[in-house]
Amino acid sequence: MEVWWKRECLRVDETKLFSALHRAHHQSAFRANVSSVVAAQTFEASGDLSKAIAAAILTLGRKHAPLEQTYQFLSMEEPWREVPGMLKRGAKVPGWGGTFQRDKPDPLWQEVDDLLADIWPATYIKISSVTTTLIEHGKTLYPNPSAYTAAVALVLELPKELVSYLFIGARLAAWSMIAQKQLTQEGVG
């Protein structure tokens, strides 16, 4: 598969990972997360899909999808070693914890997790070691979509400054479907 950020095409295993990431993001977008809620509300208020998508994108960052911070964290050789200090300072570990899956790993992201474990063990070890360290320090937190998106960006050699492309590109269809559903509901009401 050709991608715009690399000279060479993605290998078959990389294409599988890219596709799995897209599927997981698409499914995740139908939850009441902040970007999807803002997209729906903006479309309802404006009737303009472009504004709804722009508003959804503007929610990305520090609290919702801290993609660049998570990428930087997972770029460290041993990110799990940073966790105790982060917790001591009261800082959040970017890419861990979530609104929808608090007590166990998110099943929507299992395919991405499995592919990382099977084909990119070094990346998977970083993720699982951070999770283990959090649990050892009394924080039952699991990787969220930001962690998986950043991990895939690292594996596919997408620069940190462009990691949001994976998130946005994978959620565009879902955000559009959310808007279309509102149009259908308005026509009925």
Regions found by a protein language model. Give the residues of each.
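Non-transmembrane, aqueous-exposed alpha-helical and coiled segments at domain scale
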Residues: M1-G189
